[in-house]
A protein has these predicted regions:
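Cofactor-binding beta-sheet edge motifs in enzyme active sites
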Residues: 2-30, 37-716
Length: 716
């Protein structure tokens, strides 16, 4: 079970959550020892807490989750971590979304947010300590009740047992007594050999809610007296309203308001369809601004010009230019990828209710405190007066780290004095995104007389994601060269540099961020190096990764499981790629069939070996890898955002297609055993998909794919 909390104030948070179920509360700070305790109505609200465990007198255990659930099963995974150390009955566990508060700030981002495969990694230690603290307090409560030493008691599946006397007590019966005890400053954590929850394939806690329809997504929110809004936005990036005539829109039956907001003109109506009809009737003249001449062609030209010049040096080992000059053989290549939209299944939406002293926001957000700050600014209130109610997310992929849809809803609600839901159409969503940056990469490599690489030069030009958040030091954005600046291959001379190229198209975080395009660049070109040196692509990688044991292990596992080197059926071909990013290691082998006469490609199988530390829930991890394959194949085979006259040309899934069910290959997932802390898997398993696929196409056709998405001529 999962529900939302309706407030920010910690004391109110506790009272609301514990209504009718007094018991043991344990909270803890991310960076400090365990601290503070709240016991229902009678306890004191803890300060700067990061997450919570509540053991109710009814034996229910509630884990409060400060992360966003967008399909990755984080509700279940984080609950498993706390429940393991608590030693509770898993069937008695439920979860609740925590409110927005600085106490929950993700140390990676500086905001409360979910992304970069950080949710499990940053919660692993705090949640284990919270669960263990609650367990120790329950043991102490039982020991005091029975007049025995705590060391004689043990916890098991929601019960404390005293073996010598056979006495037993449920957690619920001990909760109130435990709540009166101090939180221990140091708690013993389980030996992983004792784990009975973590590491076991576990069904998702939110599946029943999604099956019966009770899971609330942002698009499902309803509030008393709520109106519905659609926003007309300038089709050209950077444009704004010059003037508008609202007469025809206001004449549409059911339209209540037509108002200008910072991002365009809002039509407010009795329902979303009527608001859309009102937008169709609205007459707007746009000031199209400075980007009206931008096109995909001009952007590509800009990138090529920038990449031809030296830029900020992101990595330098040895003297790559001199080594290239003395190499026995030289190869060069240029790679290019387009802008990409996020295309979340649930389009952007937000419901807001602004009053004189309070603002409530219901949003499918990945960044609660950013949404809170944006809403506070738009409402003219302090952040403490803004209450963020996080819903389930119908996909995130980084898009919902933005707060543009929150600002719109708050501005409209403030203007009309009523709660309002803003809904984006699919066309709005595709044409007003913060896109994965288009990128351009030049490569040069030098080989010795035996065909091994001795020089590697990589120049990248693309927009900066981080530039809109503040000035770039030395005009450098590390996300733009992500993984290219940390190339794992043992090559003695390496030079990687970067040039910012800003064509005026808004860019943002997209699943795996810079690694998404740079994985394609790097792993495609290393395949070219193997071919030029007359090496097997797998064997070349093996030798160059000899000093990187975790990376080498996933490479060897993927190759072995895929049968690398074994004969394939006629017309079948393989490609391989391996990437490390977001603290994870992954290798993939893609098997395809190609009909060169018809220029048709079928992806048959993807074999994936990954090392992400300890696997908390292997079944969810496998699902994450499968979804990464879908996302990676969609980007490689189908997707491109193209620009003409400063406008996005794509409108819906008819011209921005995604992978269909019948196109989905078999995906074999092999999780490497590990005793290391978990990292997460939502990001790093995306980047190898495209290069492994394109390397398989080269094996089939002898043609290199250096530009995505793949075209029919690449299969000839």
């Amino acid at each position: 079970m999962t529900r939302n909390l309706q407030g920010l104030d910690r004391r109110a948070f506790l009272k609301t959550s514990a209504a009718g179920a007094a018991g043991l509360w344990v909270g803890f700070h991310l960076h400090e020892p365990l601290e503070a305790l709240a016991a229902g109505e009678t306890g004191t609200a803890p300060v700067a807490l990061n997450a919570w465990v509540h053991v109710g007198t009814d034996d229910l255990v509630t884990i409060f989750i400060d992360k966003s659930e967008m399909g990755q099963s984080i509700l279940t995974g984080l609950a498993m971590i706390a429940a393991e150390e608590l030693d509770c009955n898993w069937k008695k566990v439920r979860t609740e979304f925590a409110p927005a508060d600085k106490a929950y700030v993700n140390p990676w981002f500086g905001v409360q947010g979910t992304g970069a495969s950080s949710a499990t990694r940053t919660s692993w230690d705090p949640l284990r300590k919270a669960g263990a603290a609650a367990r120790m307090m329950l043991l102490e409560a039982a020991a005091q009740k029975w007049g025995v030493d705590k060391s004689e008691c043990r916890a098991e599946s929601g019960t404390v047992l005293h073996a010598a006397t056979g006495r037993r007590a449920s957690y619920g019966s001990l909760a109130q007594a435990a709540a009166k005890l101090p939180i221990p400053s140091d708690v013993p954590l389980k030996d992983p050999k004792q784990y009975r929850i973590v590491g076991k394939p576990t069904k998702r806690l939110d599946t029943p809610l999604k099956v019966n329809g009770s899971a609330q997504y942002g698009i499902d929110v309803r509030q008393p007296g709520m109106l519905y809004a659609i926003v007309a936005r300038c089709p050209v990036f950077g444009g704004k309203v010059a003037s508008f005539d609202a007469a025809k829109a206001k004449a549409t039956p059911g339209v209540k308001h037509v108002i200008q907001i910072s991002n365009g003109v809002a039509i407010v109506a009795d329902n979303t369809w009527t608001a859309m009809e009102g937008r169709h009737a609205l007459e707007v003249k746009w000031d199209e601004g400075p980007n009206v001449s931008a096109s995909s062609g001009s952007i590509s030209k800009l990138f090529a010009e920038r990449a031809a010049k030296p830029g900020y040096v992101a990595r330098k080992e040895g003297d790559a230019e001199a080594a290239l000059g003395h190499a026995a053989k030289k190869i060069e290549a240029v790679y290019e990828v387009p802008f990409l939209a996020h295309a979340t299944m649930e389009p952007q939406n937000c419901t807001a209710h602004v009053r004189a002293d309070r603002c409530d926001v219901w949003a499918p957000t990945q960044a609660q405190t950013s949404a809170q700050a944006t809403a506070a600014e738009a409402a003219g209130l302090k952040p403490e007066a803004v209450f963020i109610h996080t819903t389930f997310l119908g996909g995130g992929f980084g898009r919902r780290f933005e707060a543009d849809f929150v600002r719109e809803a708050v501005e409209i609600s403030k203007a009309i004095g009523s709660p309002v839901k803003v809904t984006w159409s699919r066309e709005d969503d595709l044409q007003h995104d913060y896109y994965r940056p288009a990128s351009y990469a030049r490569f040069a490599a030098g080989l010795d007389a035996d065909g091994w690489p001795v020089a590697w030069i990589n120049r990248i030009a693309c927009p900066s994601i981080m530039a809109r958040f503040g000035p770039l030091k030395d005009n450098f954005d590390s996300r733009s060269v992500e993984i290219c600046d940390s190339i794992p291959y043992d090559i003695p001379n390496i030079l990687v540099d970067y040039q910012v190229a800003d064509p005026g198209i808004p860019v943002g975080f997209w699943r795996s961020v810079g690694a998404s395009q740079n994985g394609f660049f790097l792993e495609s070109f290393i395949d070219e190096v193997a071919t030029a040196g007359k090496k097997d692509p797998y064997e070349l990688r093996r030798r160059l990764l000899a000093k990187s044991p975790r990376h080498l292990a996933v490479l060897e596992t993927a190759a072995q499981k895929a049968g690398w080197g074994a004969p394939l059926p006629t017309g079948h071909f393989r490609g391989i790629a391996t990437v490390t990013s977001y603290f994870g290691f992954v290798a993939q082998v893609v098997e395809i069939s190609v009909d060169r006469g018809k220029r048709e490609l079928k992806v048959l199988r993807v074999v994936c070996a990954l090392d992400c530390g300890r696997a908390v829930n292997p079944s969810s991890l496998e699902a994450q890898v499968q979804s990464s394959v879908v996302y990676g194949l969609t980007a490689a085979l189908r997707s491109a955002i193209t620009i003409d006259r400063g406008r996005v040309q794509q409108t819906n899934f008819n011209d921005y297609p995604v992978l269909r069910i019948h196109e989905m290959p078999a995906v074999d997932v092999h999780i490497m055993p590990s005793q290391l802390p978990p990292t997460g898997a939502g990001e790093f398993t995306v980047p190898p998909v495209a290069p492994a696929l394109c390397n398989a196409i080269f094996a089939a056709t002898g043609r290199r794919v250096r530009r995505l998405p793949i075209r029919a001529e690449d299969l000839a």
